[in-house]
Amino acid sequence: MSSSRSSRRQFLASGAAAAVSLGFPAITRSRSPNAKLNLVFIGVGGRGGGNLSSISGIPMALPKKGGDKDGAKAPPAPSASDAAENIVALCDVNAQNLDFAAKFHPGAQTFRDFRKLYDTLKASEIDGVVVSTTEHTHAYATLPALLMKKPVYCEKPLTHNVAEARLITKAA
């Protein structure tokens, strides 16, 4: 009589094989360019610049000119077409921050006032908004996006008082 019991090693091997075969289609599937999100960034200096770099996949720092001390050449700077997402608009009250970020995302519209940004862009052009402004403007920069029924990533704190929190809650 043969035993139907399997060893622990056989069990783990068959379990690992099943897990790999089930996950394989997700690993091999490539992302369609049409699947990119159209994002708006309000506040692109400091923390906002970090958020922009992280989400777009384009580091906002210039490569070393002439290579490093070992003679290796710096890699070419990524272009906006290499971005993980479509950056459709950049907004910052500081012109220097805005100009610097715009160099890395030349196709993005630029604004110095988020109210003009919301007045100019149509809801259909925006898939999401990232708010990284100074703390006292978070709620006011977030509210119009929520009224457009767009998802928002906002740095903390979202609000500074109960009245702002109630407005945001009602809009969401």
Region annotations inferred by a language model:
Residues 2-151, 166-170:
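N-terminal glycine-/serine-/threonine-rich beta1-alpha1-beta2 phosphate-ribose binding loop
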Residues 149-161:
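ADP-ribose/adenylate-binding Rossmann-like module
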Residues 158-172:
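Rossmann-fold NAD(P)-binding glycine/threonine-rich loop
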